[in-house]
Amino acid sequence: MALSEDTIKAVEATAGLIAAQGIEFTRAFYERMLTKNEELKDVFNLAHQRTLRQPKALLDSLVAYALSIRRINELYELKGKDLPWTGHLAELQGFFSVAERVANKHTSVGIQPAQYQIVGAHLLATIEDRVTKDRAVLAAWGKAYEFLADLLIKREEEIYAETEGSEGGWRQTRTFRVEEKARVNEVICRFRLVPAKGGASVVQHKPGQYLAIFVRNPELFQHQQIRQYSIMSAPNSAYYEIAVHKDGAGTVSRYLHDHVDTGDLLEVAPPYGDFFLRYLEAGEQAAADTQASSEFQVLQGRAVNFAAEKTAPIVLISGGIGQTPLLSMLRFLAQKEGRETARPIFWIHAAHDSRVRAFKEEVDAIREAALPSLRVVTFLSEVRATDREGEDYDFAGRINLDRIPELARLEAGHANPHYFFVGPTGFMTAVEEQLRARSVPDDRIHFEMFGPFKASH
C-alpha cells in the first residue's frame, strides 16, 4: 500500500517536532502504553525503560523512519508496479538494517500482529497529547505507522516460518534443560542447554546469533522477564551454550547465577539475530539468490559471503562478555577451515583485569588444535603484580588497534580485513572511532551493541 503525497508531507513536517521533544516523547508513550496494557510488561525489558535506553532507541528509529519515508514509499511503489526497485536499496540500507534488527528482536520475544495495533493506538495518542491535535496529521501518522507495521509483520512472519521450517526448529518457546552449569570466574557462568525431550535436535544457529530466555518467578519478580544471550558454541544440532555475566543490577543475570542449576528447565526461543558470520557454500548461495524476493533478502544476498572470500582476513574484537558471539564465529571457522585456512584471523580481547578475563583456555585450545596461525592479542585495563606480559596479557591499558602493527600491514597491503566487534557501549564507541580513523570501509565494519541501540552493521 503506497502512501499519498499529503501523508508523506504531514509526517515529514512533524518529524522535527517529535525529535525536539527528545526522549520525553517516547518515555510518555511507554508510560501510557505499559500503564494501560499491563500484559506488555511481560514482553518489554523494564530495566531498559528505567535507564531510558529503550525510549532513546525508539525515538531515534521513529525520527529516522519519518525522514526516510518518501524514499521508502518510492521503493514500494516501484515494487508494486513490477518496476526495477532494487536500486533504492543502497541509500535505504541503514533503514532496512534497523528494521531487520527490530524484526529479529521481535521474533525472539514472540511479538504478534495484534500487538502492533496496541502500539499504534498509544503512539497516535501520544502524538495527539504532545505534538498536535490536527486530525489530518494524526490520520497521516496512522497511515505511516500502518505502513511500517505491515512491513515488519511480513518480515517477522518470514523469520518465524524459516526458523520453524528448519530441521530442529520451532516457533515461540520450547522447554530446555540445563545439562551443565559451570562457573567461569567470579562474574561469569556458562550454561549448556539441551531439549527437555531427550534425543530431540535443535535448529543450528548462525555463528553470532542469540537465544532469548523467558523467566517467570513470582516470588522474585512480578512480571515475566525476557533476555537475549549470545550463543558461544559452534553451530550444531544437539545443544546451545551461553555465558551470562552477573550484573549487579541485572534481574535475570542474577537469577540465572543464583537460582538456576544443572537439571533445571528454562523456556527458550529459537536462535535469532542479524549479526552473524555469513558462510554459504556455492549451492547454498545459489538457492539463497533464487529465493531472494523481499528487500531484506536482497540486502542479505549482497552481504559478504566468507565461504566465497576464502582469503579475506577476519578480525574478531571483543570487550568483556562481548566475546561470546565471536567465540561462536571462531569455533565455526575452526570447524570449516581449520589448519587449511588461507585467511589471517585475529582474536583481540579487552578485559578489566585477568581475574575477570574469560575463555582464555578455550581460545588457546582452538589455536593449538585447529588454527595455529590465529593471532591472539589481549589488553588489560589493570595489570596485577602476578600478571605476566606475553602470557596473561599483551598490552596494558584500554584497547588501541594502533599497537598491533600486523593490522596496519594488512590494511596497507590492500587485504582489507573484516572487523567484527562486540562489547559494552564505551568500548564499541572507541573501536568504531579507531576503525573510522584508519579509513576502514563501511562494508568491512560489522558490529553489534548489547541492548536497544544501533542496528548491527
From Swiss-Prot:
InterPro entries with a match to the protein in the record: Cbr1-like_FAD-bd_dom, FAD-bd_FR_type, FNR_nucleotide-bd, Globin, Globin-like_sf, Globin/Proto, OxRdtase_FAD/NAD-bd, Riboflavin_synthase-like_b-brl
Annotated spans, Reductase: 168-456
GO MF term set: FAD binding; heme binding; metal ion binding; nitric oxide dioxygenase NAD(P)H activity; oxygen binding; oxygen carrier activity
Transmembrane stretches, start-end: none
Residues under site feature: Involved in heme-bound ligand stabilization and O-O bond activation: Y30
Listed Gene3D superfamilies: Globins, Nucleotide-binding domain of ferredoxin-NADP reductase (FNR) module, Translation factors
Keywords: Detoxification, FAD, Flavoprotein, Heme, Iron, Metal-binding, NAD, NADP, Oxidoreductase, Oxygen transport, Transport
Domain of life: Eukaryota
Annotated EC: 1.14.12.17
Entry binding sites for heme b: H106
Catalytic center residues: Y116 (charge relay system), E156 (charge relay system)
Signal peptide: none
UniProt key word Ribosomal protein: no
Co-factor remark: Binds 1 heme b group. Binds 1 FAD.
GO biological process, any: nitric oxide catabolic process
Record-listed FAD binding positions: Y210, R227, Q228, Y229, S230, M449, F450, G451, P452
Annotated positions for site Influences the redox potential of the prosthetic heme and FAD groups: K105, E448
Cofactor(s), by name: heme b; FAD
UniProt: NADP(+) binding residues: G320, I321, G322, Q323, T324, P325
Similarity section: Belongs to the globin family. Two-domain flavohemoproteins subfamily. In the C-terminal section; belongs to the flavoprotein pyridine nucleotide cytochrome reductase family.
PANTHER family from the UniProt entry: FLAVOHEMOPROTEIN
Subunit structure: Monomer.
Entry note about domains: Consists of two distinct domains; an N-terminal heme-containing oxygen-binding domain and a C-terminal reductase domain with binding sites for FAD and NAD(P)H.
Functional summary from the UniProt entry: Flavohemoprotein involved in nitric oxide (NO) detoxification in an aerobic process, termed nitric oxide dioxygenase (NOD) reaction that utilizes O(2) and NAD(P)H to convert NO to nitrate, which protects the protozoan parasite from various noxious nitrogen compounds. Therefore, plays a central role in the inducible response to nitrosative stress. May also be involved in O(2) detoxification.
Protein name, entry field: Flavohemoprotein-1
